[in-house]
Swiss-Prot record:
This is Pyrimidine-specific ribonucleoside hydrolase RihA. GO terms for molecular function: purine nucleosidase activity; uridine nucleosidase activity. Disulfide bonds: none annotated. The active site is at 240. InterPro entries: I/U_nuclsd_hydro_CS (IPR015910), Inosine/uridine_hydrolase_dom (IPR001910), IUNH (IPR023186), Pyrim_hydro_RihA (IPR022975), Ribo_hydro-like (IPR036452). It comes from Klebsiella pneumoniae (strain 342). Gene3D superfamilies: Ribonucleoside hydrolase-like (3.90.245.10).
Amino acid sequence: MALPMMIDCDPGHDDAIAMVLALASPELEVKAVTASAGNQTPEKTLRNVLRMLTLLNRPDIPVAGGAWKPLMRDLIIADNVHGESGLDGPSLPEPTFAPQNCTAVELMARVLRESQEPVTLVATGPQTNVALLLASHPELHAKIARIVIMGGAMGLGNWQPAAEFNIFVDPQAAEMVFQSGIPVVMAGLDVTHKAQILPADIERFRQIGNPVSTIVAELLDFFMAYHKDEKWGFDGAPLHDPCTIAWLLKPEIFTTIERWVGVETEGKYTQGMTVVDYYHLTGNRPNTTLMLDVDREAFVDLLAQRLAFYA
């Protein structure tokens, strides 16, 4: 039986590719997609969800837009990474269907209520919508099997020296998620920086030759440009968000550990830092499964295999 799940995302090139991977996988049943503000402004990320689902011919999946800003601060966006539209590069179709007449939290709550079994929630952007869901519907916590997030890191940042972008955008929301008591699986920079897509991989995807694989290659062409800056020291581009979906499909290609994680919400230099109790110094019980490593070749093979689904 397919795993019931929802995706909360802020497309974003890697969010879009995570959607492509999920919807090419019969092991997963995507019951809803909600949009968060992050990589771009909320109206743009919502439009990008609709554009991607139009490309993938999935107007049957309900969509809703979420919070317009983080819980306690102004919105920060990553237009320097993802461009003016949030999905710059390829020519994507205009949406052929409309979002639901409800908020992201209302849609997620409806899916949880109606599901006969617990639902996995994948969140590849800031955690604002997820935190609002948890705060407003404590009666539904038991219906959430796990929350799989892309965000954070054990020891480095990509937006601030100590903070990864998704967590830095809304650290208060992320802290609520980690301390919710619901199992969290974290794909942080420790693993996503090892899930790099190289130029040869992009050409492999392009050669698959269907409309979706071509769009994915063009998304990666644009995404690659930002990551060529020498400061990163990358050979390619880290494909952050698809690690969440890949873990659901093939957990055996990832190396993980169980640890307690908290989020620094106020630090002068460390606001947005995910604090990982690696040596069990706090006495807190582990609340998070952290991905630390990935078989890069197996990860790329999985993407290529699932892109062929769209032939």
